[in-house]
A protein has these predicted regions:
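N-terminal Rossmann-fold NAD(P) dinucleotide-binding loop
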Residues: 31, 155-158, 216
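Beta-loop-alpha module in the N-terminal Rossmann-like domain of NAD(P)-dependent dehydrogenases
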Residues: 179, 188-246
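C-terminal helix-rich "cap/oligomerization" subdomain common to oxidoreductases
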Residues: 199, 206-208, 406, 421-461
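Rossmann-fold dehydrogenase core element
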Residues: 244-262, 283-287
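Predominantly a Rossmann-like dinucleotide-binding segment in NAD(P)-dependent oxidoreductases
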Residues: 263-333
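Contiguous beta-strand/loop segments that form the cofactor/metal-binding neighborhood of enzyme cores
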Residues: 313, 319-390, 420-429
Length: 461
């Protein structure tokens, strides 16, 4: 079926309109062959290129090139008449009707998947070029070898999550307890159980510090001085001077230093911050967030000698939205802690800014609802428990007809988002680390240090 093509901007001829979609990452001959075959099906070829955020929301963690670089590469093939951006699920139906499309073309690896589009246009599955793919090309490019320090539960979750991100391999692990390290490597398919820290550092390009938090500073410093990139688990460090020193070393060595704060990198929180910064609920006047877990009294998390306690274990989570949204210029903080054996089982912190307030509750020996509420002059945002790994939040207003529910994916354990950001930053060091900045991380360390030093800490019996 042929039709007159609408003349938009005087560029379109008359004839059949063909549309195809893809990420087109690391453009290769397979992509070019598909575009050529799609062009042969009609007179005008429209190509939809996915955005970085849409890829991330679909769980596509391995995209190497930015959307603009991918768009430019598609244009330069010479087969494409028009490029559009694919931003949301279901857009294909909208585009087919909007552009009066005759033929939808896609690779044969999607055979049958897009048959539902036959209601709107002809669907053609094009033969795929064998022996080449973006994934294969990415794997042939530089791969970051990651060494893991620590073999606890979080390290065990890191290894399978890293497999969802291209451009990295877990090459080695280290634990002073050699038997534990050997078992961990055997269980997770890691080729080397390093006998010493130096041996680990000699066999990796980057280090994931997943040891007890009171050891983060020493391990991160040793790795940076050895010229390694560092991803350190939360809480990063517990003292301001340590945070400042580590970032100073990272800068001097031109190495990436990141905190493995999965909330900061997950799609829902990223969108939440962007919406709030745009003024969707007006001016923010208050934030309240809670993170509590009931912990066995014999746990190391409640060991005073190992800097255990609710603040040291959990405060990094609510500190993220408070500092991210209200800033680093905190006028005053008061801490109210219920203590047992010199460890805070539950702490409430109250923040005062010039034009806003904030508070959080953290606990290891008490339980409360783990939600977050952000109040503004025009409405508020409610994030249900567990807000720190949310895939959903609500915008609520005085006029309930304006309320909105926002859903975003949270894949697996969520660690793949921070790993993706870490690997991407190493491979593309010109990128700006804006999702969790050095200044914000240092501000969090300052709050942790204030608590450890007893500044405005009120201990309750």
């Amino acid at each position: 079926m042929s039709k007159d093509i609408p003349n938009i901007g005087g560029d379109r001829p008359h004839g059949r309109i063909v549309i195809t979609y893809g990420t087109f990452d690391v453009l290769h001959q397979g992509h070019i062959n598909l575009l050529r075959r799609a062009k042969e099906l009609g007179d005008w070829l429209i190509v939809g290129v996915t955005t970085d955020n849409f890829d991330l929301e679909r769980g596509k963690m391995n995209t190497r090139d930015s959307v603009m670089k991918r768009v430019q590469a598609v244009k330069e093939t010479g087969y494409v008449d028009e490029v559009i951006i694919e931003e949301y699920k279901g857009q294909k139906i909208d585009d087919i009707q909007k552009y009066n499309v005759d033929v939808f073309a896609i690779g044969s690896d999607w055979e049958g998947y897009f048959d539902y589009l036959k209601e709107y246009c002809e669907v053609v599955y094009l033969p795929r070029t064998q022996g080449i793919s973006s994934t294969m090309l990415r794997e042939e490019q530089i791969s970051v070898r990651i060494g893991i320090i620590g073999t606890g539960s979080i390290a065990g979750r890191f290894v399978p999550e890293a497999k969802f991100v291209s451009g990295n391999t877990v090459s080695a692990a280290y634990n002073p307890d050699q038997e534990e390290c050997r078992k961990f490597c055997l269980a997770n398919g890691i080729p080397m159980a390093a006998r010493t820290l130096d041996e680990l550092l000699a066999n990796c390009d980057a280090v994931y510090v997943a040891s007890p938090h009171y050891t983060h500073y020493e391990y991160a410093k040793a790795a940076l001085l050895a010229g390694k990139h560092v991803l350190a688990e939360t809480p990063f460090v517990l003292h301001l001077s340590e945070a400042e020193e580590l970032f100073s070393i990272a800068g001097a060595k031109e190495r990436t230093l990141m905190v493995a704060h999965k909330t900061a990198y997950c799609p829902a929180f990223r969108h939440l911050v962007s919406m709030l910064k745009s003024g969707v609920i007006g001016k923010i006047v208050d934030i309240n967030a809670s993170v509590t877990t009931l912990t066995d009294e014999n746990s190391s998390k409640l060991d005073h000698a190992r800097f255990g306690g609710s603040m040291n274990e959990n405060a990094c989570f609510p500190l993220l939205p408070i500092i991210k949204l209200l800033g680093r210029d905190i006028r005053n903080i008061n801490f109210y802690s219920i203590m047992k054996n010199d460890v805070d089982m539950y702490t409430k912190a109250v923040f005062r800014y010039d034009n806003a307030t904030a508070s959080f509750q953290v606990g290891l020996g008490a339980k409360t609802e783990g939600n977050m509420v952000i109040s503004g002059t025009q409405g508020y945002i409610y994030v249900p428990a567990p807000w720190w790994k949310t895939d959903y939040f609500e915008l609520r207003f005085e006029d309930q007809n304006m309320n909105r529910k926002c859903f975003y994916p949270f894949m697996g354990e969520g660690l793949r988002y921070e790993i993706r950001e870490f690997v991407s930053q190493i491979l593309n060091p010109e990128q700006n680390l804006y999702l969790l900045t050095k200044e914000e991380i240092i501000a969090m360390a300052r709050v942790q240090e204030d608590y450890i030093n007893g500044k405005n800490v009120y201990k309750l019996s």
